[in-house]
UniProtKB/Swiss-Prot annotation:
Homodimer. It is an enzyme of class 5 (isomerase). GO terms for molecular function: ribose-5-phosphate isomerase activity. The keyword Mitochondrion does not apply. Pfam families: Rib_5-P_isom_A. This is Ribose-5-phosphate isomerase A. The gene is rpiA. Pathway: Carbohydrate degradation; pentose phosphate pathway; D-ribose 5-phosphate from D-ribulose 5-phosphate (non-oxidative stage): step 1/1. Catalyzes the reversible conversion of ribose-5-phosphate to ribulose 5-phosphate. Keywords: Isomerase. It catalyses: aldehydo-D-ribose 5-phosphate = D-ribulose 5-phosphate. One of its GO terms (biological process) is pentose-phosphate shunt, non-oxidative branch. InterPro entries: NagB/RpiA_transferase-like, Ribose-5P_isomerase, Ribose5P_isomerase_typA_subgr, Ribose5P_isomerase_type_A. Belongs to the ribose 5-phosphate isomerase family.
Length: 224
């Protein structure tokens, strides 16, 4: 599995050229992309500016010598590469397993091009096998949790290693929704967007046109 992740990370790095502002995703697969960019910066004198999507990715990029800027310090991002937790047949996706969904969606929104890198296990006909993360303001979050229970979304709190409620980089909580099959991802996204106290959710609908997939038969690119 790790070899598949590394393959797509290296493949995605081929789309990066000197002079680009590059969005650096978060997660185990995106980490291989960042690692390959670091190698190219050191060995090929690749000149880029990275915009990170989490404190974890910032630390990795700094250690690799990749120059960084905030999303607010650049005019736009040329290309963002990130992983995904689940992708349906229309290239809608669920992200946020690494608790970085808010920063990931902000960087993706201001990117000219956006690519996901995954192994084939992340592909499915419909979304729903992976939990939908919802980042929420801490104040009033128990009330939101009850709302999700009433909607039969089987909510659970995202916890840290100590068993306490995880706090995101932006100082929010995450409530994970467990919905067996999401027939209409956009309808669910619209519903969540209207809920007071919801900061962002992990439904990334109609945001990517290209997915790089690694599988038993090698690396392939799915475009839409």
């Amino acid at each position: 599995m790790e070899n598949l992740k590394k393959q797509v990370g290296i493949k995605a790095a081929e789309f990066v050229k000197s002079g680009m502002v590059v969005g650096l995703g978060t997660g185990s697969t995106a980490a291989y992309f960042v690692e390959e960019l670091g190698r190219r910066v050191a060995e090929e004198q690749l000149e880029i500016t990275g915009v990170t999507t989490s404190s974890v990715t910032s630390e990795q990029a700094k250690a690799l010598g990749i120059p960084l800027a905030s999303i607010d310090e650049v005019d736009y991002v040329d290309l963002t590469v990130d992983g995904a937790d689940e992708i349906d047949s229309h290239l809608n996706g669920i992200k946020g397993g690494g608790a970085a969904l808010l920063m990931e969606k902000i960087v993706a929104t201001y990117s000219k091009d956006y690519i996901w890198i995954v192994d084939e296990s992340k592909l499915s006909e419909n979304l729903g096998s992976f939990k939908v993360p919802v980042e929420v303001i801490r104040y009033g979050s128990e009330q939101l949790f009850k709302e999700f229970e009433r909607a039969a979304y089987a909510p659970t709190w995202r916890l840290n290693e100590e068993g306490e409620k995880l706090i995101t980089d932006m100082q929010h909580f995450i409530i994970d929704l467990h919905i067996a099959k999401i027939e209409n991802p956009q309808k669910l996204a619209d519903e969540l967007d209207l809920m007071v106290g919801v900061v962002e959710h992990g439904l990334f609908n109609d945001m990517v046109k290209k997915v790089i997939v690694a599988g038993s038969d090698g690396v392939k690119i799915i475009s839409q």
